[in-house]
């Protein structure tokens, strides 16, 4: 019996091999298979946002002006969510709502679902791009894993939260002032700042900023090979093989400052990865909870005592009153389709009003 060993070669490359060769070719901007998802979705999401903020009104969905054409600026323009009556419709251009009429589609808020869905898939494509490139150059995929944090936040806030509510109407509109309004809405209707998942998110993001600042400063402080350049950026060759800072010196410094310090670079950098990504994931989980209308902490005993004793008040009870004010003043303005009318005597009044 004879066994022939050799490399199997096909006489002619199939379509997959041809596409793979072109997509993964070494070029200035890597395309890759992930680029088939990333580039079209990112293009349509960004293009839809610029189109909406430039030309499209929110008069028919929110009773607002939201475009440059109507007099808004960069901070006040937005691509607004569809009307509440449209619930969770995908608002396809060719769907039963718009029936192929582009103007009507824009008036109904079709650009919001267009931007949100293409944006979500664009972010996923960017994460897949990091996976693909990491595999190509034989790196571990931690960059892609880290980027899952922002994706989780985007998907939870813009997609899962409104899916748990009555419609896309209650998602954030894509604009600076619109996001601020959404933050106030979250506080007034969900007491979001007292939610433990929000607390973990704040700790993660601000803790990561602190770690980043400390790490950068420590590396700069422990440089031990000065070059001939006029400053740090000119002094070193970006392709040099050897390190030019001292981990030992940094460890000694922080051991004296705190009593403890990282002695292992892998653990240090994993910690810098873990803190912000975990914070973002926790905040995303919290928003999923809000989609189901799960409540934050309720200190009912303090509320009862504050109601019975005029001299007893805590920062918590003051915040509860502020939330009531936000709801009462915001609901009528924010949800004009409900035709809410609150008599003056039930609207909260205080020093700030």
Curated annotation (Swiss-Prot):
Phosphothreonine found at: 2
Gene3D superfamilies associated with the record: Photosystem II protein D1-like
SUPFAM superfamilies assigned to the protein according to its UniProt record, in alphabetical order: Bacterial photosystem II reaction centre, L and M subunits
Topology in the lipid bilayer: Multi-pass membrane protein
InterPro entries noted in UniProt: D1/D2, Photo_II_D1/D2_sf, Photo_RC_L/M, Photo_RC_L/M_CS, PSII_PsbD/D2
Binding site for chlorophyll a ChlzD2: 118
Sequence positions that bind chlorophyll a PD2: 198
Residues annotated as binding Fe cation: 215, 269
UniProt: a plastoquinone binding residues: 215, 262
Record-linked PROSITE patterns: REACTION_CENTER
Keywords from the named record: Acetylation, Chlorophyll, Chloroplast, Chromophore, Electron transport, Iron, Magnesium, Membrane, Metal-binding, Oxidoreductase, Phosphoprotein, Photosynthesis, Photosystem II, Plastid, Thylakoid, Transmembrane, Transmembrane helix, Transport
Modification type N-acetylthreonine: residues: 2
Cofactor binding comment, as recorded: The D1/D2 heterodimer binds P680, chlorophylls that are the primary electron donor of PSII, and subsequent electron acceptors. It shares a non-heme iron and each subunit binds pheophytin, quinone, additional chlorophylls, carotenoids and lipids. There is also a Cl(-1) ion associated with D1 and D2, which is required for oxygen evolution. The PSII complex binds additional chlorophylls, carotenoids and specific lipids.
Membrane-spanning ranges: 41-61, 125-141, 153-166, 208-228, 279-295
Source organism superkingdom: Eukaryota
Protein localization: Plastid, Chloroplast thylakoid membrane
Other facts: 2 of the reaction center chlorophylls (ChlD1 and ChlD2) are entirely coordinated by water.
Subunit field text: PSII is composed of 1 copy each of membrane proteins PsbA, PsbB, PsbC, PsbD, PsbE, PsbF, PsbH, PsbI, PsbJ, PsbK, PsbL, PsbM, PsbT, PsbX, PsbY, PsbZ, Psb30/Ycf12, at least 3 peripheral proteins of the oxygen-evolving complex and a large number of cofactors. It forms dimeric complexes.
Protein name: Photosystem II D2 protein
Organism: Cicer arietinum (Chickpea)
Source organism phylogeny: Eukaryota, Viridiplantae, Streptophyta, Embryophyta, Tracheophyta
């Amino acid at each position: 019996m004879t066994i022939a060993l050799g490399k199997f070669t096909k006489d002619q490359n199939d379509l997959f091999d041809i596409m793979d060769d072109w997509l993964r070719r070494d070029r200035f901007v890597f395309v890759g298979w992930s680029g088939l998802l990333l580039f079209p979705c990112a293009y349509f999401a960004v293009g839809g946002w610029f189109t909406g903020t430039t030309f499209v009104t929110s008069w028919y969905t929110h009773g607002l002006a939201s475009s440059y054409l109507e007099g808004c600026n960069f901070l006040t323009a937005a691509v607004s969510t569809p009307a509440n009556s449209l619930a969770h419709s995908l608002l396809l251009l060719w769907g039963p709502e718009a029936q192929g009429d582009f103007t009507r589609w824009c008036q109904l808020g079709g650009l919001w679902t267009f931007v949100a869905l293409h944006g979500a898939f664009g972010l996923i494509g960017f994460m897949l791009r990091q996976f693909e490139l990491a595999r190509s150059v034989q790196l571990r995929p931690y960059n892609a894993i880290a980027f899952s944090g922002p994706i989780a936040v985007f998907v939870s806030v813009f997609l899962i939260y409104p899916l748990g509510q009555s419609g896309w109407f209650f998602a954030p509109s894509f604009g600076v002032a619109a996001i601020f309004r959404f933050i106030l809405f979250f506080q007034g209707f969900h007491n979001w700042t007292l939610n433990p998942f929000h607390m973990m998110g704040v700790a993660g993001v601000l803790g990561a900023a602190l770690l980043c600042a400390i790490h950068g400063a420590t590396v700069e402080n422990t440089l031990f090979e000065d070059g001939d350049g006029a400053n740090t950026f000119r002094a070193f060759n970006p392709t040099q093989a050897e390190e030019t800072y001292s981990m030992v010196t940094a460890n000694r410094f922080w051991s004296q400052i705190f009593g403890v310090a990282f002695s292992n670079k892998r653990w240090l950098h994993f910690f810098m990865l873990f803190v912000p990504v975990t914070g973002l994931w926790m905040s995303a989980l919290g928003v999923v909870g809000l989609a189901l209308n799960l409540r934050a902490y309720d200190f009912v005993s303090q509320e009862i005592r504050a109601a019975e004793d005029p001299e007893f008040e805590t920062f918590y009870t003051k915040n509860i009153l502020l939330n009531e004010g936000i709801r009462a003043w915001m609901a009528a303005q924010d949800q004009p389709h409900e035709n809410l009318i609150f008599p003056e005597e039930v609207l909260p009044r205080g020093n700030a009003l």
